[in-house]
Amino acid sequence: MIYGRSLFHIIASLIILHSSGATKKGTEKQITPETQKSVQCGTWTKHAEGGVFTSPNYPSKYPPDRECVYIIEAAPRQCIELYFDEKYSIEPSWECKFDHIEVRDGPFGFSPIIGRFCGQQNPPVIKSSGRFLWIKFFADGELESMGFSARYNFTPDPDFKDLGVLKPLPACEFEMGGPEGIVESIQILKEGKASASEAVDCKWYIRAPPRSKIYLRFLDYEMQNSNECKRNFVAVYDGSSSVEDLKAKFCSTVANDVMLRTGLGVIRMWADEGSRNSRFQMLFTSFQEPPCEGNTFFCHSNMCINNTLVCNGLQNCVYPWDENHCKEKRKTSLLDQLTNTSGTVIGVTSCIVIILIIVSVIVQIKQPRKKYVQRKSDFDQTVFQEVFEPPHYELCTLRGTGATADFADVAEDFENYHKLRRSSSKCIHDHHCGSQLSSAKGSRSNLSTRDASILAEIPTQPVKPLIPPVNRRNILVMKHNYSQDAADACDIDEIEEVPTTSHRLSRHEKSVQRFCLIGSLSKHESEYNTTRV
């Protein structure tokens, strides 16, 4: 019976707890967005050594439906220690789902969580791993309590303990403004804010014109020690340099564009002594929201930028609307940007290439022409005169009709000789015709050798003296010069007078007379003799 009653009480307690939890959840869902504003609330004191912050109305009960966010920032190379050593009371719940304090190791609500606390027991001492702590206090609409009081201070970062006592950081701040501008880390060295071996913590304050906002776009970004935010980072603040206005922080390998909601932007760069090679370059553009005024350009992304930024070679809009129709201007600007040195180098190189091409073409044209001219200069026209201009023989008119038969024989002999010369003229060189004799004077010796071979084959016979016939008419013989060395062996006197007879001479006698006649013609150049028989 006792066990039955105990079991009944346990079941009843569970039902009550469940119903109360459902009521809490329904109340939590009824909280409006206006009551859940992530803003700082309660008391806050800050100084170089630390500070104190509390829940609203502490040590009285905190009001319902409240959400307060506190961000603590330490100096470079320092960490944060957080203490809850005063009276403390927050509504208890399972896993602190209702009223609670949430602490994260970093500057954002998505930073790694350290813990969530509620109830009557004070939280332990909390230490950050870096320069920031993010603390949120949340209260639902029921069961309020006294709240909390927290104290914090700064301690040296253990990651830098090997460096000993560090020098104070140099003052490093810049002021910029206007429709656009470039923020770059190289300004630190250019303006002598710090040396190349010093750690830097620099800030750039950007102020836009009235009723304008700021758009930031990275042109260059590189961290020497990527993913080590303690050693180097670039941070963007919207409205002030306070940690509550931290918009974005980059310490990895990628940096995204940032759109600010106010007209004041702060860029902060931190780099220790071993990260001075970290660099960035950022373009800021002041813009207004539509409707655009007359002296502005609409970027099709709810941005109105100054007309002077259109086609200036830089993308000032989120998308490159301001540079899309500037091809001609880009070409002109590219030529204008060529320095005198580069222009000279390009001009000289082009001239050298053109000269080499011209010389190469001339050489290719002249080389075969040279060979042709050389061969033409070696050509001796007298050597081939007998080939191209064979001699002409003309017969004189007859003084009578009685010697027609004898004269026909002479004409036939000359005609045969012409045919022989034409056929032999086709062989310019001895080896073309198979001759075994070498020629000292070109084709002239070919004919002499042929005639000599004919005479060599014919046996020599004594020449019978010719008796001049009676009652025979005289004929006129015209002799034309033809150079022939082989004719030197004949005596012209022996053939000066050639009697014409009615009887036929023997074939051998005709050959001898024909050979001597040709030889004599070669001795007397362009000479005409009249011989009366």
Curated annotation (Swiss-Prot):
Cytoplasmic membrane side: 366-533
Record field: transmembrane: 345-365
Tissue: Expressed only in brain. Present throughout the central nervous system. Highly expressed in the hippocampal CA3 region, olfactory bulb and tubercle, caudate putamen, and neocortex in the adult brain.
Record's keyword terms, sorted: Cell membrane, Disulfide bond, Glycoprotein, Membrane, Phosphoprotein, Postsynaptic cell membrane, Receptor, Repeat, Signal, Synapse, Transmembrane, Transmembrane helix
GO BP terms: anterograde axonal transport of neurotransmitter receptor complex; memory; neurotransmitter receptor localization to postsynaptic specialization membrane; positive regulation of excitatory postsynaptic potential; receptor localization to synapse; regulation of long-term neuronal synaptic plasticity; visual learning
Keyword Signal: yes
Domain CUB positions: 41-155, 172-287
Membrane topology of this protein: Single-pass type I membrane protein
Disruption of the gene: reported phenotype: Depressed long-term potentiation (LTP) at Schaffer collateral-CA1 synapses, NMDAR-dependent spatial learning and memory. Rescued by the ampakine CX546 at physiological doses.
Pfam family of the protein (one): Ldl_recept_a
InterPro entries assigned: CUB_dom, LDL_receptor-like_sf, LDLR_class-A_CS, LDrepeatLR_classA_rpt, Sperma_CUB_dom_sf
List of residues that carry Phosphotyrosine: Y417
Domain LDL-receptor class A: 291-327
Disulfide pairings: C41-C68, C96-C118, C172-C202, C229-C251, C292-C304, C299-C317, C311-C326
Motif (PDZ-binding): 531-533
Keyword Zinc: no
Glycan attachment sites: N306, N340
Function noted in UniProt: Involved in the development and/or maintenance of neuronal circuitry. Accessory subunit of the neuronal N-methyl-D-aspartate receptor (NMDAR) critical for maintaining the abundance of GRIN2A-containing NMDARs in the postsynaptic density. Regulates long-term NMDA receptor-dependent synaptic plasticity and cognition, at least in the context of spatial learning and memory.
Assembly and oligomerization: Interacts with PLZ domains of DLG2, DLG3 and DLG4 via its C-terminal TRV domain. Interacts with GRIN2A and GRIN2B via its CUB domains.
Protein name: Neuropilin and tolloid-like protein 1
